[in-house]
Amino acid sequence: MKVVHTICPGCSVGCGIDLIVKDDKVVGTYPYKRHPINEGKNCSNGKNSYKIIYHEKRLKKPLIKKNGKLVEATWDEALSFIAEKLKNYNADDITFIASGKCTNEDNYALKKLVDSLKAKIGHCICNSPKVNYAEVSTTIDDIENAKNIIIIGDVFSEHALIGRKVIKAKEKGSKVTIFNTEEKEILKLNADEFVKVDSYLGVDLSNVDKNTIIIINAPVNVDEIIKTAKENKAKVLPVAKHCNTVGATLIGIPALNKDEYFELLKNSKFLYIMGENPALVDKDVLKNVEFLVVQDIIMTETAEMADVVLPSTCWAEKDGTFINTDKRIQKINKAVNPPGDAMDDWLIIKSLAEKLGSDLGFNSLEDIQQDIHRNKLL
């Protein structure tokens, strides 16, 4: 038995988590007590995050659709098929979707491939705020020292460890004001003042000062809020949705809100999706797609619609880095081997590039990390 230190993939807080491994299988989790963010505390989602590794719909082999059914294929067959299809489309008709659930290295590799093809690329931030992270320097640790905490949206339901920091600050005497479009009991319970708003555009920030931190987890214009905060010397902490939403953005992949994301999908003929599942929300956004490739860890609703499905490794089966919501670069560590023929996302992308006759300039994870560093992206 061994214990592997890594980072929880459940949200953007970036909590440390220990995976308990026995006979090359993760059998449980244990608090990473020395981790600076969560100090050994993990929410229920974090404690159960390893269970996705053994999901009943876990992908283990490449699949190609033949006569309306997805059947097993070799990697060579699947990648050759994709490469041949790609050659039939103009760059304007080709779209690649990156993911805030994949590592920096995976997303960077995908961006390099897309740049070589001059195609379109984006990643969905869902209902998270769209942020210029160069303007953000606030950390999660700043929450406990704030005298006045304003929350726009909800950090208690999906980002429990940030919620915990807010509660600790409140116990020290901080005033907590929460603005939300829904009247949730968990928000009312933890607020000194709860304000229901029809729109997040109606949030009143007239009383912010140097002792204020504004925590945002809602689709708002963060630039305007940052401007107001700077004028009053307040701090702003945007909260991203996924474990590496921030990383995907900093790597240089356009961050798309839900409407922008769906519009991009609707205008794509060749669509390659890495680690996302838009069909779960609306299958109709894919109705104009002529050829669909899905690269993922399980058979999702989107993968079921695909012409080719490529099995990738999950967070516990690879090395790499995530960037959390306050821009900390953190290393994830491989704990177990992947099932079947599943491959790391970056390696799948490199292999596809080779089928297209393109050299992306890297042969290892370390090569990618050096390239990222050389280009001063992170």
Swiss-Prot record:
* Annotated positions binding [4Fe-4S] cluster: 8, 11, 15, 43
A GO-annotated cellular component: membrane
Give the record's keywords alphabetically: 4Fe-4S, Iron, Iron-sulfur, Metal-binding, Molybdenum, Oxidoreductase
Matches recorded under Gene3D superfamilies: 3.40.50.740, ADC-like domains, Dimethylsulfoxide Reductase, domain 2
SMART domains per UniProt: Molybdop_Fe4S4
- Cofactor(s) this protein requires: [4Fe-4S] cluster; Mo-bis(molybdopterin guanine dinucleotide)
The cross-references to InterPro entries, in alphabetical order and at most eight, read: Mopterin_OxRdtase, Mopterin_OxRdtase_4Fe-4S_dom, Mopterin_OxRdtase_prok_CS, MopterinOxRdtase_cofactor_BS, Prok_molybdopt-oxidoreductase
**Which Pfam family, just one, is annotated for this protein?**
Molybdop_Fe4S4
The 4Fe-4S Mo/W bis-MGD-type domain covers which part of the protein?
1-57
| EC number(s) recorded for this UniProt protein | 1.-.-.-
Explain how, and how many, cofactor molecules are bound: Binds 1 [4Fe-4S] cluster.
The lineage's top-level taxon is Archaea
Question: What sort of enzyme, by top EC class, is this?
Answer: oxidoreductase
GO terms (molecular function) for this protein are: 4 iron, 4 sulfur cluster binding; metal ion binding; oxidoreductase activity
* GO aspect biological process, one term: respiratory electron transport chain
Protein family: Belongs to the prokaryotic molybdopterin-containing oxidoreductase family.
Q: Report what the protein is called.
A: Uncharacterized oxidoreductase MJ0006
Q: Which organism is it from?
A: Methanocaldococcus jannaschii (strain ATCC 43067 / DSM 2661 / JAL-1 / JCM 10045 / NBRC 100440)
